[in-house]
Regions:
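Bacterial Sec-dependent signal peptides at the C-terminal "C-region" and cleavage site
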Residues: 16-25
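Short, solvent-exposed interaction modules
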Residues: 100-134
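Short, well-ordered, aromatic-rich surface patches in folded extracellular/luminal domains
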Residues: 124-159
């Protein structure tokens, strides 16, 4: 399994090397320092090293599975709760998206939600599962592109870690 980031409710991500903005000006895909959602994942500096996050295409969208070592479950749940709280405040209008700093991943997640993608989050004892689905082919295509980008960015992070460039 790939080392990972998070399966957030809006969560749906890590490395400092990838956290800087790209030369094109688009935000980094994962930004553990600047993203209002993702920064919750590094409050416990050992959390990311002790969890996995995998993404899979399914017929009508994508599936993500997150596992966390038992001794880090509390930190993970605290991060999840903080991210969910931000998501709820955005949905209710208490916060405006323009006022909430977000990485590329979290921006894309929000865009998919605005396109009508349906999300389900299942919290289990052994793993958490996140589903993002749609009945609209154009939205399914975007969901799968999102999952592929996550796989690609996680692979880059894994390569950077192996090369000793991350963290």
């Amino acid at each position: 399994m790939k080392r990972a980031l998070f399966a957030a409710a809006f969560v749906a991500i890590a490395a400092v090397v990838i956290a800087s903005a790209s030369p094109t000006g688009e935000p980094a895909w994962f930004d553990m320092q600047g993203c209002a959602f993702c920064k919750n994942l590094v409050k416990d500096p050992e959390l990311l090293k002790n969890m996995t996050w995998e993404h899979f295409d399914i017929s009508n969208g994508a599936l993500s599975i997150t596992t966390v070592k038992p001794e880090f479950k509390k930190s993970y749940m605290e991060a999840q709760a903080a991210m969910m709280d931000i998501g709820k405040k955005l949905q209710s209008g208490e916060l405006k998206a323009a006022d909430v700093p977000m990485c590329g991943h979290c921006q894309a997640y929000g865009k998919l939600a605005q396109m009508g993608a349906k999300t389900e989050y299942i919290q289990g004892a052994a793993a958490d599962i996140w589903l993002m689905t749609s009945d609209k082919p154009e939205v399914v295509k975007e969901i799968k592109a999102f999952a592929q980008r996550n796989r690609d960015e996680l692979a880059k992070m894994e390569q950077a870690e192996k090369a000793g460039q991350a963290h």
